[in-house]
Amino acid sequence: MYAVIENGGKQYRVTVGDKLRLERMEMEPGAELALDRVLMVGVGDDVQVGRPLVEGAAVKATVLSQGRAKKVHIFKMRRRKHYRKQQGHRQYFTEVRITGIEA
């Protein structure tokens, strides 16, 4: 069984047992959460597609940790003008493990 969920403007295909990095949520490690924005649920060849969401479907997950991703370096430069600008960014994330899919 698998599901397609939406979180933070991105879509993820998940199955039970998957580890996933989602946008940061203010939750402690070990906390349970239910992701109810389920776009699609599939069992073998039987697929249920929502319009836009599947009614009554939810994905259960457990928070594993909070963290920050690797740094993304931004470098701007104008040729021949000696203009250079550097910037960096580290995105916060919440790592979760999928524990169940209800459809």
Swiss-Prot record:
GO CC term (a single one): ribosome
Example of a GO MF term: structural constituent of ribosome
InterPro entries, A to Z: bL21-like, bL21-like_sf, Ribosomal_bL21, Ribosomal_bL21_CS
Keyword line: Ribonucleoprotein, Ribosomal protein, RNA-binding, rRNA-binding
A Pfam family reported for this protein in Swiss-Prot or TrEMBL: Ribosomal_L21p
SUPFAM superfamilies tied to this protein: L21p-like
UniProt keyword Ribosomal protein, yes or no: yes
GO biological process: translation
HAMAP family recorded: Ribosomal_bL21 (MF_01363)
Subunit structure: Part of the 50S ribosomal subunit. Contacts protein L20.
Family: Belongs to the bacterial ribosomal protein bL21 family.
Role summary: This protein binds to 23S rRNA in the presence of protein L20.
Protein name, per record: Large ribosomal subunit protein bL21
Lineage of producing organism: Bacteria, Pseudomonadati, Pseudomonadota, Acidithiobacillia, Acidithiobacillales
Designated gene of the protein: rplU
